[in-house]
C-alpha cells in the first residue's frame, strides 16, 4: 500500500551540496558540490544493489521490526559491533565487508537478524532493490536532519524521513501529500509561456520565431532548476508580498520538485508543469534580475553568434513576458486561450542530468557518466543559469520546426497541415458556415452534450468529496454526503441503507458528486487501490427526475479524467442486470484487463451481479471526447467536399448492370482514379493468413536483427525520456509488434506497415535530426522498405 504524510507549510529548501544539503535560500545560484553529492548517492545505490543478497538483508534488517515470537518491540536490527563514528575512509576499489550471518543476534533485543527479515524471504530482487534505494534516501535525510539549522527545514526533512522509514517497515510506496496533488494551477507556467510565444510572436517569419522559441525554452528550463529563497528570506526582501501564499507554493515545490531530485524514491515533477501564474509572479522579479546579472558577467565567455541572443533578445523577451505575468487581464493565462494557426509550440521541457557548460546553448551536449552506471539528476544544477537544455538525457524532443523549414518525411497519405488549418478556420467560424442556426442541440448530438453545456453555464458542478477522520468535518461536504446517501438509497432500493451509509461515509471511499442548484442529484462512489492499479466503483446513480439528460455519461467522463490525473487506469465494478447497459455505453466490458490476483480479496462481490472492467487511455480527454470526434467528422466531411469540388467532370451512371452484369472491377468505373482511389496490386495482399504471417514474421525478424534497430526494441521508458508520452500520442516498438504478430493481429500488410512506420515517425518527431536515434530511424526505415519490396508486398 502507498504511504503518505502531511508536510508542514512554509518549509525551507533542500539542497544537495556534498554529503548534506547546503543552506537554503540562495536563489538560482548552485553550489559546486551539488553534482558530486547527487552522484555519490547514485553510486552508493548502484553498489548496494549489486551486493549479494545476505548483505542486502543485513542492510534492510536495520530498518525492519523484529518478528520473533513474544511481540518483540524492537524496530530495527542493531549490530553487536557498530561501525566507528565517523567511519574510516574507504580506499579505492576496496572489497565490500562480509555480510553477517542471519543468526547474528541484535544488540537491542537479542533476537537473530533472521527474525527481523522474515518478511523478505520471498521478495523479488527488483522489490528489494527498490527498498534499498529508500534506505539510502532515509540515511541521507537523516544526515540532513542533523546538519540543518533552520527549524522549518529540519521539520520537513524529518517528515520525509519518517515517511520513507515507514515505507521500509510496511514495504509501501511513498506518497507525499502537501495540501493537494499536482498540478496546482492551470494553465501551467509551461503552457502560459507557450501561449505568450503564440500571442506575441506568431506573426514573425519562421527563423525569427525560432529564436523566440529557443529563448522560451531557456527560460522554462531555468525555472525547473531555480532554487527558491526561503519564506523568511522572502519576508525580509519583500515584506509587503503574500508570504503565507508563498509558503504554500514553497512547500509544494520543496516536496514535489526539489527533494526528489536526489531522493529518487519520492515522485518528482517539473515546476513548469505543476505551477502557474501565482508561482511565477512570486519568483519572476528576483529571477529576472539574477539571470541578466549573470548574463553580463559571462558575456566574455559567449561566442559571437550567441551574444546578441543572450544580451539583446533575452532581456527584451523577459521584459515583454513580465508585462503578461503581472497583467490582470492577459489572455495567455486563460485556459481557453486559442493557439494561433501559425508558429510552432514549445515542446515539453525535459529534465536531465546537469553538466558543467558555458552560458550559451549547445545543440549536442555530452552525457554525464557515473562510476556506478547510468546518470543522476542532482538537486542543484551546476550548469549556467541561462542554459536552455541540460544534456545527457535519452531521446530528447527536438525543437519545433515550422512547416516550411521541416525536412522530415511525412507519413504516406498525410494531409498537409495548411489544409487542416484552413478547414478548421471554416468550421469554427460561424460566418463561414452555411445552414440553419445551431443554437439548439441537434438530434444527433452526443449523450453528454447537454450536460457539458450546463456545466459551462454553471448550472451543474462536479466535486470529489469524502469523509475524513483527520480534519474537522465541513458542513457543506457532510450535507452533500447525506444527499448522496439518499440518492443511492432511493435509486438502489435492493441495497441495504445501512450498507450504503457505511460506504459513503467510509474515509477510504470517495464520491464524485453531481451538484445542481446546491443539492446533490447524482454521484459515483468509488474506492481507489493505487498499489493494485485499479479503482472499484461501488455505487453509481442519478436521481430519477434528472435522468436521460446525459448526466450519467458526463459524470463517468469526469471520473475517468480524475483517475488519469492520479495515474490509475482501470475501473472494476459489479453491475446488476439494470446497470449493464449503462456501463457498456461508458466503455466497460466483461473482458477484464486487470489480473485476477490483483483484485481478488480487494473488491466486494455481489450476488447476481456481473463483474465488468474499463481500461482508460491517458491520451484521451474524456470530458471533451465527443466534441473532438464531432470536429474530426466535420473536418473529414469538409475535406471530402473539397475533393469533390476539384472533380469537375460528371460521368453518366453505369449501364452495365441493366445488361445482366452482376459485378465489375472497381478500377473500371469511369473517373474512379481521379478521386484519388488506387487499386491494390493483386500480388500485394497475401490472402492466405499463414503465408502472410510467415512473410511478416520473416521481415520483422530481419528488422530486429539490423544493427540500427537497438533503440526501438522495447517501449520507451518514462524515466529515460520524461515527457515522451506527452509528445508521442501513439507509441510503438518492435517488442509490441512481435506480440501483435504472435496474436495474429496483423490480418493485412497495411496494419503491419502502419505500425512499423509509426516507429520511425515517432522517433523523428521526438528527436532532433542530428541525434543518433534519428539516424537509426532513417537507416532502419530504408532497410525495412527494401525487405517489404523483396517480399512483393509493395511495388519495387
Curated annotation (Swiss-Prot):
Q: Which GO terms describe its molecular function?
A: diamine N-acetyltransferase activity; histone H3 acetyltransferase activity; histone H3K9 acetyltransferase activity; protein-lysine-acetyltransferase activity
Question: Which segments carry the region annotation Disordered?
Answer: 1-32, 77-97, 371-408
Q: Name one GO cellular component term.
A: nucleus
Keyword ATP-binding, does the record have it?
A: no
Q: Where is the composition biased (Basic and acidic residues)?
A: 392-408
Q: Where is the Bromo domain?
A: 687-791
UniProt-annotated catalytic positions = 536
UniProt cross-references to Pfam families, sorted A to Z: Acetyltransf_1, Bromodomain, PCAF_N
Name the reaction it catalyses.
Answer: L-lysyl-[histone] + acetyl-CoA = N(6)-acetyl-L-lysyl-[histone] + CoA + H(+); L-lysyl-[protein] + acetyl-CoA = N(6)-acetyl-L-lysyl-[protein] + CoA + H(+); spermidine + acetyl-CoA = N(8)-acetylspermidine + CoA + H(+)
| Chief site of localization | nucleus
- GO biological process annotation, one example: positive regulation of transcription by RNA polymerase II
Listed SUPFAM superfamilies: Acyl-CoA N-acyltransferases (Nat) (SSF55729), Bromodomain (SSF47370)
Q: Which InterPro entries match?
A: Acyl_CoA_acyltransferase, Bromodomain, Bromodomain-like_sf, Bromodomain_CS, GCN5, GCN5/PCAF, GNAT_dom, PCAF_N
Provide ranges: composition bias, Low complexity: 10-24
Q: List all disulphide bridges recorded for this chain.
A: none
Q: Where in the cell is it found?
A: Nucleus; Cytoplasm, Cytoskeleton, Microtubule organizing center, Centrosome
Task of the protein: Functions as a histone acetyltransferase (HAT) to promote transcriptional activation. Has significant histone acetyltransferase activity with core histones (H3 and H4), and also with nucleosome core particles. Has a a strong preference for acetylation of H3 at 'Lys-9' (H3K9ac). Also acetylates non-histone proteins. Involved in heart and limb development by mediating acetylation of tbx5. Also acetylates spermidine. Together with kat2a, required for growth and differentiation of craniofacial cartilage and bone by regulating acetylation of histone H3 at 'Lys-9' (H3K9ac).
Per the record, the similarity remark reads:
Belongs to the acetyltransferase family. GCN5 subfamily.
* Protein name stated in the entry: Histone acetyltransferase KAT2B
Amino acid at each position: 500500500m502507498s504511504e503518505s504524510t502531511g508536510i508542514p507549510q512554509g518549509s525551507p529548501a533542500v539542497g544537495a551540496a556534498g554529503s548534506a544539503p547546503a543552506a537554503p535560500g540562495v536563489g538560482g545560484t548552485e553550489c559546486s558540490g551539488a553534482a558530486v553529492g547527487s552522484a555519490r548517492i547514485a553510486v552508493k545505490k548502484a553498489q548496494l544493489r549489486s551486493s549479494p543478497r545476505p548483505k542486502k538483508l543485513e542492510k534492510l534488517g536495520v530498518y525492519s521490526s523484529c518478528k520473533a515470537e513474544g511481540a518483540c518491540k524492537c524496530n530495527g536490527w542493531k549490530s553487536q559491533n557498530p561501525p566507528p563514528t565517523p567511519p574510516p575512509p574507504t580506499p579505492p576499489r576496496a572489497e565490500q565487508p562480509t555480510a553477517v550471518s542471519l543468526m547474528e543476534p541484535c544488540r537491542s533485543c537479542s533476537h537473530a537478524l533472521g527474525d527481523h527479515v522474515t518478511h523478505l524471504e520471498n521478495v523479488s530482487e527488483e522489490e528489494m532493490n527498490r527498498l534499498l534505494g529508500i534506505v539510502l534516501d532515509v540515511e541521507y535525510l537523516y544526515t540532513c536532519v542533523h546538519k540543518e539549522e533552520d527549524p522549518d527545514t529540519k521539520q520537513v526533512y524529518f517528515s520525509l524521513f519518517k515517511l520513507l522509514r515507514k515505507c521500509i517497515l510496511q514495504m509501501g510506496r511513498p506518497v507525499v501529500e502537501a495540501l493537494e496533488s499536482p498540478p496546482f494551477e492551470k494553465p501551467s507556467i509551461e503552457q502560459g509561456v507557450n501561449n505568450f510565444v503564440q500571442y506575441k510572436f506568431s506573426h514573425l517569419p519562421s527563423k525569427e520565431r525560432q529564436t523566440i522559441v529557443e529563448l522560451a525554452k531557456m527560460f522554462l528550463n531555468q525555472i525547473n532548476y531555480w532554487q527558491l529563497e526561503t519564506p523568511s528570506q522572502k519576508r525580509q526582501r519583500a515584506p509587503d508580498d503574500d508570504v503565507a501564499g508563498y509558503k504554500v507554493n514553497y512547500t509544494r515545490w520543496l516536496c514535489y520538485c526539489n527533494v526528489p531530485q536526489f531522493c529518487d524514491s519520492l515522485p518528482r515533477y517539473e515546476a513548469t508543469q505543476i505551477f502557474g501564474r501565482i508561482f511565477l509572479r512570486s519568483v519572476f522579479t528576483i529571477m529576472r534580475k539574477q539571470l541578466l546579472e549573470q548574463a553580463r558577467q559571462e558575456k566574455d565567455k559567449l561566442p559571437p553568434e550567441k551574444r546578441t541572443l543572450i544580451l539583446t533578445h533575452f532581456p527584451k523577451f523577459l521584459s515583454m513576458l513580465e508585462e503578461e505575468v503581472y497583467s490582470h487581464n492577459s489572455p495567455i493565462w486563460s485556459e481557453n486561450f486559442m493557439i494561433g494557426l501559425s508558429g510552432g509550440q514549445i515542446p515539453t521541457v525535459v529534465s536531465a542530468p546537469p553538466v558543467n557548460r558555458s552560458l550559451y546553448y549547445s545543440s549536442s551536449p555530452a552525457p554525464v557518466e557515473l562510476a556506478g552506471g547510468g546518470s543522476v539528476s542532482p538537486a542543484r544544477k551546476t550548469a549556467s543559469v541561462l542554459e536552455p537544455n541540460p544534456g545527457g538525457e535519452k531521446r530528447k524532443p527536438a525543437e519545433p520546426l515550422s512547416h516550411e523549414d521541416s525536412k522530415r518525411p511525412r507519413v504516406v497519405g498525410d494531409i498537409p497541415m495548411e489544409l487542416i488549418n484552413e478547414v478548421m478556420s471554416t468550421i469554427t467560424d460561424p460566418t463561414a458556415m452555411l445552414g440553419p442556426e445551431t443554437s439548439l442541440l441537434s438530434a444527433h448530438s452526443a449523450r453528454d452534450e447537454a450536460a457539458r453545456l450546463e456545466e459551462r453555464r454553471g448550472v451543474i458542478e462536479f466535486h470529489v468529496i469524502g469523509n475524513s477522520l483527520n480534519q474537522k468535518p465541513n458542513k457543506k461536504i457532510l450535507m452533500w454526503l447525506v444527499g448522496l446517501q439518499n440518492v443511492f438509497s432511493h435509486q438502489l432500493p435492493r441495497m441495504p441503507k445501512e450498507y450504503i451509509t457505511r460506504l459513503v461515509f467510509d474515509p477510504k471511499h470517495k464520491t464524485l458528486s453531481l451538484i445542481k442548484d446546491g443539492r446533490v442529484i447524482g454521484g459515483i462512489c468509488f474506492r481507489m487501490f493505487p498499489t493494485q492499479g485499479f479503482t472499484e466503483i461501488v455505487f453509481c446513480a442519478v436521481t430519477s427526475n434528472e435522468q436521460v439528460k446525459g448526466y450519467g455519461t458526463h459524470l463517468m467522463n469526469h471520473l475517468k479524467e480524475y483517475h488519469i490525473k492520479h495515474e490509475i487506469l482501470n475501473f472494476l465494478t459489479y453491475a446488476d442486470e439494470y446497470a449493464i447497459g449503462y456501463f457498456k455505453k461508458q466503455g466497460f466490458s466483461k473482458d477484464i484487463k486487470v489480473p485476477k490476483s490483483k483484485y481478488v480479496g480487494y473488491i466486494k462481490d455481489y450476488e447476481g451481479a456481473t463483474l465488468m472492467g474499463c481500461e482508460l487511455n491517458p491520451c484521451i480527454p474524456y470530458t471533451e471526447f465527443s466534441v473532438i470526434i464531432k470536429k474530426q467528422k466535420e473536418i473529414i466531411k469538409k475535406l471530402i467536399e473539397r475533393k469533390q469540388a476539384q472533380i469537375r467532370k460528371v460521368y453518366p451512371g453505369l449501364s452495365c448492370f441493366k445488361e445482366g452484369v452482376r459485378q465489375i472491377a472497381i478500377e473500371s468505373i469511369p473517373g474512379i482514379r481521379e478521386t484519388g482511389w488506387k487499386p491494390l496490386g493483386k500480388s500485394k495482399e497475401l490472402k492466405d493468413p499463414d503465408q502472410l504471417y510467415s512473410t511478416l514474421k520473416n521481415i520483422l525478424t530481419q528488422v530486429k536483427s539490423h544493427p540500427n534497430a537497438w533503440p526501438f526494441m522495447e517501449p520507451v521508458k518514462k524515466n529515460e525520456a520524461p515527457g515522451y508520452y506527452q509528445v508521442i500520442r501513439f507509441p510503438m516498438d518492435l517488442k509490441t509488434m512481435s506480440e501483435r504478430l504472435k496474436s495474429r493481429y496483423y490480418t493485412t500488410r497495411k496494419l503491419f506497415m502502419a505500425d512499423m512506420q509509426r516507429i520511425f515517425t515517432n522517433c523523428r518527431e521526438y528527436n532532433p535530426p542530428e541525434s543518433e536515434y534519428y539516424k537509426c530511424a532513417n537507416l532502419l526505415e530504408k532497410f525495412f522498405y527494401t525487405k517489404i519490396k523483396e517480399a512483393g508486398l509493395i511495388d519495387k
